[in-house]
C-alpha cells in the first residue's frame, strides 16, 4: 500500500496526504491482526513467566539522593564501595538531572541499614569527593503494596469510565471495540516493560495512563468520523466507510503522533536516566496506540455486527420520532391537542 507522502502548505494549513484519496487500510487488517496477536499473547507470556520488576514505589525500599560539589559523581567507584555491602551491592545508582547528582535505590527493608540509612551511605562514600545527602525517602512494604493496588485500580477504573463514555457518546459496539483496543495497548505496553526490565513505579503508571489517553483520543477521532460518514457516505459497506473515514483523519493522526514522538524522544535523549523508563513506555505506547486505533478498534466494529444500512435506518427513525415530538409540542402550545 503506497501512501505517496507529500507535504503541502495551503495557506496556514498543512496537508500531508491527498485529501480526496481513499487508502485501503482494511485490506491490510489481517497483517496487523497477526502482528497484534503475536505481540499481545507474547506479552501475556512474558508477564506470566518473567513478570514485572516493581520499583520502590510499589515494592517498598529506600531512595537516597546525593549531590557532589567539586566533580561529577564517581558512579563506578561508588559501585565498587557498595559491592562490599550485602544490602547495597544490588542497589541501583543513576544520574539525577546532572552528572553531579545521583540517586541510590535499594529494595531491602527500611531498617536493613539501621535507623539512618543516609548516615550509612555517607560513611561509605567518604573519600569519593565533597558531597551532601540531599534526600532520603523510605517506602515501607505495606505502603508499597497499597500503592500497587491503587495503581491497578486506577487502570481498571479508567477502562470502565472509557466504556461508559463511549457507550453514551456513540453506542455499545463502538464502546466494546474501544475497550478491546485499550486492553490490547495496555497488555502490549506492560509486556514491553517486562521485556526491557523497566522498574514499575508511579512514573510507569503515569506513562501507562497517558498512553491510554492518547490511544483513546485517536480512537474517538476515527469513530467520530466513521459515525459521520456512515450517515453521509456514498458507500454502504462498513470496511469502505472505515477506509474513507481513516483516510480523512490520516493527516491529523500522523501529525499528532509525530509531534508527540518528537517531544518524547527529546525526553529520552536529554531527560536523564530517571525519566528513561517513562519515555520508552511513551514511545512504544504511542506507536502501538496509533496502530490499534486504525487496525484494531475500527475493524472490530464488523465483529460486533455493526451494519451501515441498519445504522442509517435507526438514524432516520430517530429523526422521524424527533420531528413527531416537535410537531406534537407545537400543536400542544397552539392548543390544538
Model-assigned labels for residue ranges:
Residues 2-337:
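A structural signal for conserved, well-ordered secondary-structure elements
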Amino acid at each position: 500500500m503506497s501512501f505517496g507522502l507529500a507535504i503541502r502548505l495551503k495557506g496556514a494549513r498543512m496537508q500531508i496526504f491527498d485529501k480526496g484519496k481513499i487508502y485501503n487500510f482494511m485490506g491490510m487488517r489481517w497483517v496487523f491482526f497477526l502482528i497484534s496477536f503475536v505481540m499481545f499473547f507474547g506479552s501475556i507470556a512474558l508477564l506470566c513467566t518473567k513478570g514485572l520488576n516493581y520499583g520502590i514505589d510499589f515494592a517498598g525500599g529506600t531512595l537516597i539522593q546525593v549531590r557532589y560539589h567539586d566533580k561529577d559523581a564517581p558512579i563506578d567507584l561508588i559501585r565498587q564501595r557498595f559491592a562490599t555491602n550485602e544490602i547495597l551491592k544490588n542497589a541501583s545508582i543513576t544520574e539525577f538531572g546532572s552528572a553531579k547528582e545521583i540517586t541510590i535505590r535499594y529494595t531491602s527493608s527500611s531498617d536493613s541499614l539501621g535507623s539512618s540509612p543516609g548516615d550509612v551511605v555517607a560513611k561509605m562514600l567518604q573519600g569519593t569527593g565533597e558531597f551532601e545527602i540531599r534526600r532520603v525517602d523510605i517506602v515501607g512494604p505495606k505502603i508499597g503494596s497499597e500503592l500497587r493496588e491503587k495503581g491497578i485500580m486506577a487502570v481498571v477504573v479508567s477502562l470502565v469510565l472509557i466504556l461508559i463514555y463511549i457507550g453514551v457518546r456513540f453506542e455499545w459496539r463502538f464502546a466494546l471495540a474501544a475497550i478491546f483496543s485499550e486492553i490490547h495497548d495496555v497488555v502490549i505496553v506492560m509486556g514491553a516493560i517486562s521485556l526491557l526490565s523497566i522498574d514499575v513505579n508511579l512514573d510507569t503508571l503515569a506513562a501507562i495512563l497517558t498512553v491510554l489517553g492518547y490511544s483513546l483520543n485517536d480512537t474517538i477521532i476515527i469513530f467520530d468520523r466513521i459515525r459521520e460518514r456512515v450517515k453521509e457516505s456514498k458507500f454502504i459497506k462498513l470496511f469502505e466507510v472505515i477506509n474513507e473515514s481513516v483516510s480523512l483523519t490520516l493527516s491529523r493522526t500522523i501529525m499528532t503522533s509525530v509531534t508527540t514522538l518528537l517531544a518524547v524522544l527529546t525526553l529520552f535523549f536529554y531527560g536523564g536516566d530517571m525519566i528513561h523508563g517513562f519515555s520508552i513506555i511513551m514511545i512504544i505506547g504511542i506507536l502501538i496506540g496509533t496502530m490499534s486505533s486504525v487496525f484494531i478498534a475500527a475493524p472490530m466494529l464488523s465483529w460486533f455486527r455493526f451494519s451501515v444500512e441498519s445504522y442509517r435506518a435507526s438514524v432516520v427513525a430517530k429523526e422521524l420520532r424527533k420531528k413527531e415530538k416537535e410537531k406534537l409540542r407545537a400543536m400542544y402550545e397552539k392548543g390544538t391537542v
